[in-house]
Amino acid sequence: MALTAEEAYLEELWREEDEQSEEATAMQQMLAHQHEQQHDALPSYQELMGQGSPAVTLRRAKAAAAANGTSSPGIRGSPSPARGPGGRLPSLAMGPTVGANVEQLKRRLQTVVAEVEGHQQRYDKVLLEANKATDLVHSMEAEIESLYVEAEELARRVPPAAERQRQVATWLAQRSAALEAQRQVLGGKQLELIEAEAALRAAETELDFMAEARNEIAAAQAAETAALSAAAATLRGKEDKAVAGYRRKQAAEAARLADVAAAAEDLAQRRIQAAEEAQAQAMERLKANTERIREGIASGRDLLAAEQSRRREAVLGLKESLAAVQADVAQQAELARVLQRQRRDLQEKEFGALVEAGMNPYEVFRRRDQEAAAARQHEAITSNIATRQLEVAAQLAREQEAYAQKLAARKREKKTREIFDREMGPAAQQARTEAYMQAHTVGGVSMLDPTGRVQPFPSEAVVVKTRRFGRGGAPEEVLQQQLQRLGDDTQPKQLLLPAKYRNTADTDAAAVAGLGRGGGSDDEDGMGSPPRSPSLTQQLAATQQSLTATASLAQQQQQAAGDRYKQLATRALTKHEQGLMEAAKTRHKGGIGAPQTQMGRTFGGDAFLPSPAVVEFKDFDVGRTVSASVQIINRSYKKNTFRVTGIPVEYCDVLDFAYKLPGYLAPGVSGEVVISFTPKAPVDIDTSLQLLADTGPFEVPIRCRTKRAALSVSPSAVDFGAGVTLGECATRTFTIANDGALEVEFRLDSPQLSEDERALLKSTANMAHLMTSATVAAAAAAAAATASGQGPRSARSFANMGVADGAAPETDTGPLVAPREERRLAHGGFTVFPCVGHLKGYSKVTFTVTFAPVVAAPAKLLLHASYKAPAMKRLALPHHEVTLTGTGRDVPVYVERPLIDFQCCMLGHLYRDVLVVRNGGKSAMKVMVVPRPELEGFFEFSPDFGFVQAGDSFPITIRFKPTPALLHACRKHVVEPEEEQILEIGMRLSVPDQSLPVPFTLRAQITNTDLLFQPPALDFGDCVMGERTAVKLLVRNPGRLPQTFGFVGLPSGLHFTPNDGFGYVLPGEALERLVSFQPPIAGPQTFSITAKTLAGRSFTLPCRANGVAPPVVLSSNRVRMPATPIGDTRTVSVVLINKTDQPQSYEFAVPADSDLTLSPHVGRVPPQSRLRVQIDYSPRPPVDGEQQGALPPPSAPNTARGPRDGGGGGAMANGNGSGGYEHYNDDGEPEDGEGDADGHTDTDSFQSPSARASPVQPLGRGGRGGRGGAAGEDEDEDEDAGELPVRGKSSSSSKASSGRRSSSPQLGGRQGLAMGRINEVPDDDDADAEAEAAAEAEQRTALAALKRIQSMGGGDPGWYRWREHAITCYIKPQSQNPTPSQSQSGQAPAASAPSDGASGAAAAAETAASSGPAAAPPPQEIHLQVATCAVLPDLVLLAPPDLPYVPLHQCHCLDFGPVPVGQRVVRRLELANEGEEPLVLGAESMDSREVFGLVNALRPVRPGASFRVMVSFTPQARTEYLEVLVLKSARTRLRLALKGAGIAPELQLGPEGVTATGLDMGDVLVGEAAARTLTVTNVCPFPLSFTMRLAGKASAADPNPTMRQAFSCHPAEGTLAQGESCEVAVSFTPFSQRPYFEDVLQVVVPNQQDQLLVPLRGRGWREAVFVAGPDYPEPQPDPFLLHHLAKQAGVALPPSVSGGGAAAGGAAVAAAAAGDKPSTPAPGIKPPATPPGGASKGKAAAAAAAAAAAAAAGASEPRELTLNFPHAIYPGEVATASFDVGSLKSTASGSAPGEVGVAELPAEAREAGWAVTDPPTAGAGGGGKVPLAAGERKPITLSYSAPAAPHPGMVAAYGHAEYRVLKLQLTLKGGLAALSGGPEGRKVVVAARCRLLPGSRPPGEPVPPGVTPAPEPVAASGPGAGAAGVKKLVPPPSPPKKAV
C-alpha cells in the first residue's frame, strides 16, 4: 500500500531520529565495555602492598607507560573512547581506580565498607569472650586459694577430719585441672582476639586507601550528565524541524478538506432542490385525494337521507298496527286469565276428590311436583351427557388433528432431510466438486497430480477466465438464470452486497415482510363470515388458527432484525468466566474513557444528554426516507466532545447518520446529529446510535415502528334501560376507534342471525315489507302460543317465525343486492348501521343501534366485530364483541320491581321500602294504589296516588310494622308451608289512562326475637383459685334472623370465651360458649349475669361458685410456644410452687398428639419449695391431607360442664382425658339417670371436638382417657372412650400403647382415690419385636413426611399448624402421701390393689369397700394451657437416602463410622433454602477439642438455592464420639447428630491375659537360654507396624558390665495386615548370678492410645540347686566396678576400699531388713504379682552380686535370705508362708538330681510357735531332706502360731507391733554345677519374719488368706504342749505360689 506524502515525510524524520538514538546507545555501550576492561586490569590493594610501591608511584608509572607507549605488568593500555568536553580522557585521581567503571567502583567500595563492619563485629565478639574467660580464671584462682586456706585449717584441726580433707583434696585437684584448662582457653581467646584485630586494621587500611574514590565517582557522573545534555539538545533540534514540516502538511490537508466541504455543500443544495420538487408532487397528490374524499362524503350524505326516509315510513307503518297489536295482547291476556282460573278450579276439584278418597292431596301434589322435577332433572342430565359427549368428541377430534399435524410435520421433516442429504450431503458435495474440477481444469480431470517434482502452474492446469470473472460483471442472461433458480421470493441480502449496490436493490416490501402476494378479494372471501351455528370444535379451531397466525407474525417480526446478522450458538458462561468478562469490560471501559473530576467531584453517568431521549420513526412507508435530528447536550462538569462510532451492522442499510465534528463543547452546549431512515420492509426496529465521549461510550435509542391498527370499542355493552314500549323505538350508539395509522375494514355480524336474516343484509327493495310482515307474524305467533299454554317465546323465535311465514310469498320477486355502505344488521328488534365499512388511521366510526321491540320480553343480541387490513392481508387483527340488551313492554306505565320483598322481619320493628313506578309513554299518567282492608294498620303507602311524568319515575314509600296479630289477619295470604310464616300479598296500581292495571306483590317473613339459654343457671362448683373453671353455655336462636348478643356488666373474675361474651347467633343455631370463673376469694359466691341483644331484649342468668385454694400452684397458667419449624425443638419452663408444709405429689396428663414433652411429668415437690418443669415442643411433620391453620381451640383452660352438673370442682374439656363431674346425692352415689350402666355420663351434647381425643392416662384416673383401650372393650366402649370421664366412677384400666406405664384402676365413688402405680412393660421378645417394628414404621413415616416437606417448595409457603392444649396436673391428696422411705427413694407410692387389666375393676371395688366412708378426697387438679404453632422450615437438609433419620430426636444422624485416630474424614451435606428470603447461615459452637468441625465457611443462601456444608471428623482418642451440630438461620434451627468412633491402632496379644499375668521364663542356668512364644494379631481394619521395646530395668548394685539384655525378642518389629497374626519369640538369657530378673516388654504402635505392656520374669542361677522365694541381700554398691574388676583380675581390695567382710555383711543384712518396703512401680506399668513371700523384689534385683561378694568375703559363712510373711497377725492366729527349692536341668550338660536338707527347728523356736508344715516328711523338729529330681521344684511351708496372750517378754505385750524371726538353715547338695560349699553342700539360712500386732482383730476386718483365726483354747501342760498344740493345728491351704 502506497504512503501519502505526509506519511512518507514523517517516516523519514523518525528514521533519522532512530539512527541518532542508535548511535548514542552504541556509544554508551562502548564506554561501558572499555570501563569494564580497564577495571579488570586494575591491581588490587594487596598487589600494590606486595610490590611495596605507594599509590603515587603507581600513578607516575602509569603516566610514564602512557608516554612511552608501554604498560606495566597486569595493566592493559587500551585508549578510552569516552572523552570530556576538551577532548581529554576522564580519569580517576586514585591509582587503583584509574579508568574504572563508576558502578563497579561503587560496588567495590560498598564491599570494603561491609568487610570493615563485619571485622568490627567479630572483634567486639571475641573481645567480650576473652574478657569473660579472664574473669572466670580469676574466680577459679580465688576459689582454689580459698580451698588451700581450708586445707591448711583442716591440717591444723585436732582431731583431724579425714573425710573432709579427702573431699577438699579432691576439690583442689579438680579445680586445679579445670584452672589449667581454662587458662588454655583464655590463651586461645587472646590469640583469636589478636587475629580479629589484625583483620580489622587491614580492612580499615583498605578503606582509607579507597577514600578518594568517592570524589572521582562524583566527577565521572558529572561528565556523563554533561554528555547526555548535549545529546538531548541535538535531539530537540531535530524534533523542532519535524514539527515544522508536520505543520506545513497540516495546512495543506486543511485546504483539501475545505474543498471537500464545498463539494458537500453543493451536493446538499442539489438534494434540497430535489426534495422541494418531490414535495410539490406530493401536494398535488394530496389535493386529488382530498377531492375524492369530498365526493365520497357527499354521496354518503345522500345515502343517509334515503335511509332515514325509509325508516320514517317503516315507523309510521308500525304505529298503524299498534291498536291491533294492543287488542290482540288484551285478548291473549284474557285468555291467560281464563286458563288460570280453569286450572285453579280443576285443582280445587281434584283436591276435594282426593280428600273424599281418603288421600292426602298435599302429598299427591308434592309427589307430582317431585316427579315433574325429576323429569326436568333427568332431561337436564341427559342434556348434560349429550353436551359432555360433544365436548369429548371435540376433544378427540382436536387430539386426532394434533396427531395428524405431528405426523405431517414428521413426514415433512423427513422429506426435507432427505432432500437436503440429496442436494447438500457428502455425495452431492463430492459430485459438485468433481463437476467443478472437470469444468475448470484443462484436461477435464477431477484431481490434479501433486506428486510431481515441480508444482503445476495455474495457467497450465486450469481454464483461464476473463478479467471480469468474480468481479460482479457477469452477463445479464447468467444473472437472470441464477435468479430463476432461486425463485421469486428470494431477494438479495443487503449485508452481502457491495456498498455501491446496496441502495439500488429493488426489494418487495410485502415479500420481505412475509405477508404474501395474493391478489385482492372482496369482503366475503377476504374476511369471511363467522359461523352461523358454530360448534365447539370449529370455535376452538378458529381460535387456535388466529393464535397461531398472531404468534407466527410476532415471531417473524421479532426475528426479522436477527436474520440479517446471525450469531453462532455458544454455551453459557460459568460464574468465573462471567467475572472475567466483567473485569475485561471494566478494563476496556477504563481504557476508552476516563472519569471526569472537577473540584473534587467525580461526574457519574453519561456525559451527554440526547434530546429527544429516544429517536422514534412512527408509521413509516417502505422506500421513503425520513430524517430526524437529535441534539447531543454536554451535561458534564467540564468541556467534553463526542464522536459517532456507528450503528449496528445489521441496520446499516436502512439507518444512516450525518454530523459535523463538534470539537470540545462547553457544559450546556450541544451538537447536532441527523439520523436518516430508509425502510425497506415493514418491520419494527429497536437499535441505538453508538457514540463515544472522553468520559466513555453512550448511546441514543432508535425505535422504528410500522403502521399498525390499535382498535378499541366503547362501550362494549349497550343497554336500552328498563324497557321500551311496543310500537316505539329507542336509539343508542357505540364507537370503534382506530388509534393506529393502518387502515382497516370492519364488519359486524352475529351468530344469532338466521339464513334469511343474513340474506336480508344485502337486500333493500322489500326490506320494509319484510319488517312489517315479520312484526305481524311475530305478534300472531305470540298470541297463539299464549292461547295454547306454551308460554312466551324468545325474540329470536318470533323473528324466525316472521321471516319464515311472512316473507314466503315475496320470494319470487327476488331480492335486490344493496351496496356495502347501506347494509344493516337487523335481528330481534335491533337494527345496527353501518355493519360494513372502512376505518382509516387515527379515526373512529360511530354505530347507531335502534331497538324497536315486537314482543313484551327481554331481548339480547351479541355482535361480533371483525377486521382486516387491505394493505396487509395476512395480518391477523383481534375481534371485538358488543352486547345489545333491551326489554319490550306492553304498557307505558310499569313498576321497576314487581316483587317488593321485605325479607325476614321481626315483630314490633318498622321496615321501609320504595315502590318505583315508571312511565314509558309520551304523556303524564295518574297512578293509584288499590288498598286491601286486611292490611290496615300493618302496611302504609305514602303517597297512595300521584302523576308519573313522561319518561320519568314516581316513588311510593311503603312502611311495614309487623305485630303478632298480622298472621291472624292475613292468614289467607300465608303460603305453604305455614311453619315458615311467609306472607305473599298481591297488590295493584290503577292507571285510569291505561286499560291494564299494574300488578305487584308484597312479600315478608315474620319471626320473633327470643333467645334460649341452656342451662338456665350456671353452677361452677369448686373453683381453684388462681385459674379459671369453665362450664358450657348454649345460646339458641329460635327465630329466623341472626341476632347479635352480648353479656354486659360482668362481675370480677368472670370471662366468656370466645369474643368476651359477644356473639352472633344464626337462625336455629345453638351457639356454645365457655363461661370461665376465677374466684377472687375463697368460699361460696352467688351472682348473676345479663345478656342483651340488638333487638332490645334482656335476659338474666343466676350463677354460683365455691372458691378453693390449691396446695400447689403454677408460676404461669398460660404458655405460648414460639413458632417452631418442623424438625426443631423449642423449650420453655414453668415452676410448681408448694406453699404447704408437706410434700406434694403431682402428675401431668399430656395429650398424645400434642408433640409436647414435660419433664419431669411425675414427681414430688418438697414443702415450701419450688420445682422447675421443662416443656419441650417438637412438632411432627404434616400428614397427607392435613389442612393448614388452627383447629377449633379448646373451649376454655378448664373443664366444661353439662347442664346437669352439680357439686364438685370443675374439670377440663380438652384432649387430656379429663371431663365433667356428675351430681351426687348425700350418700355419695350418683343420682338416677345421670349415668349409664357402664359408668359413663351423657355429655355428648356439650362436648367439643377437642374433648373427643383422650391422650395420656392421668395419675390416679381410670383408663377411659388413656392411649389405648383394654383388650376386652366392645364397640360402645371404644366410641365412648374419648368422652369426659366422671369423677367417682370405676372403669376398666387400660395399658398405655407406648409401653412406658400402665394406669392403675380408678376407685369408685367419693370413698377414696389411690395414686396409680407406674409399672414398666415386661421386656420380652414379642415386646421388643413390636417396639422395633413400631420404631421402623415411625422412622419411615418421619422420612416420608420430611420428603413431603422438602417437596413443598412449590406449595404454600405460609403453611402452619396452630394448636392449643390444656394440660391437667393432678395433685395427690395429702392423706395419701408416701412413707418416709418412699420419699427418700423418690418413687411414687403404689396402690394396694393389683394393676393388671383383668382384675383392675374388682381390685378397685375392694379397695373402695375396704377404705370406707373415711377415704381421702379425690386428687385436686390445676391446669396449664399451652399454645403451639408449627411452621414449615425455611432451611431444609437435602438428606441422601443413606442418611438415617431419628424420629425420637427429630434429626438426621450422620455416622462417620470407624476412623483411625488422627485421621480426618470429610462428609458433604446439602442445605436448601425453601423460604422466600435469603438466609444467613450460622452454627452453634461445638466442642473445643474440634473432633467434629465445619470445613467451609457458611455463606448466605438465596431463595430456592442450595448450599453444601462440609463436616469433618478427626478422632483424638480411641472412643466413640457423639455431638449435635446445630445449623441455624433467622427462623430455623437444623439439628444434625454427628456420630463417629475413633479407632486407635490396636494389636491383640496372646495368649489371653498375658498383659496382666506376664511371661514367666522359669529358672535358667547362667549362660543358657529359655524361650516363650507371644502371638501378635492385628484386629484393626488397616495395616499396622509394631516394634518390640524392652524397658531395661537397671540397678546400681548390678551395673551390667557386659551391656547385655537378659530378655530379647525376635522379630523385634514388623508390619501386619488386617487380621494377620505374627509369633514373637521371647528369649531369656541370664548374664550373671541374679535370682530374679524382671523387665517389661512394650509393644510400640504408631498413634497408639493404650500401652501394651507384658511383664517378663525369670531367674538365673549359677548352681543347679537353688532356693527361690526369699529376698536375697542387696549387694554393696559398686559404681566404679572396683569389685567386679578386682574379681576378674583376682586381686583383693584393701579394707578401706572394699569396706571389709563385716561391713559387707552388715550392709547385706541392713538391705535385707529394709526389704519390707515395697517398690513403687513406674507410672503406667502394672506391677507384677507379689510372690508368696510377700516382699517386693525390686530392691533385690542384684542378688547375684551380693551373693558373690558374700562368697568372696568368707565362704564359710552361710548366705542369709529373708522370707517375709505377707500379712500381719494378731495373738492366737496362725500364719503361713512358703518358698521353693529346686534343681535345674541343663539343655547342654544334661541333668543330675539334687537334695535340700532342712535343719531341725530349735526347741525355743517350736515353743515360740514356729513349725515346718510342708514337706510332711519332716520330723518332729521340722528337720529332714527334700530330694529333688532334675528339673523338679518343691515348696517348703513355714507356719507361725502366735500365742493367745503375749507373755511379758514380748513387745506386743506392751501394745507395740513386733517382728517374730525364725532362722532356718538349709543345705543344698547335688546338681550339675559344683556347689561352693564342697561335698558337704552349701549352707543357706532363711530368716522368716512375721509381724505380730497387739490386741485382737477388729470384728469387721476380714481374715487375709494364709492366716487362720485363733482356735478354741486347749488345756495343755509341759513345754511340749505348745508344740503339740501347734502340730495338731490343721494348716490352712497353701497360698498360690509366686511364679518367678
Swiss-Prot record:
Q: Could you tell me where the Pro residues compositional bias lies?
A: 1720-1731, 1896-1912, 1930-1940
Compositionally biased region (Gly residues): 1205-1220, 1260-1271
What residue spans carry the Acidic residues bias annotation? 1227-1236, 1272-1282, 1321-1335
- Which parts pass through the membrane? none
Would the keyword Cytoplasm be found if you checked this record's keyword annotation? yes
Source organism superkingdom:
Eukaryota
Q: Where is this region: Disordered?
A: 52-90, 512-548, 1159-1336, 1373-1418, 1714-1737, 1894-1940
**Can you name this protein?**
Cilia- and flagella-associated protein 74
Originating organism = Chlamydomonas reinhardtii
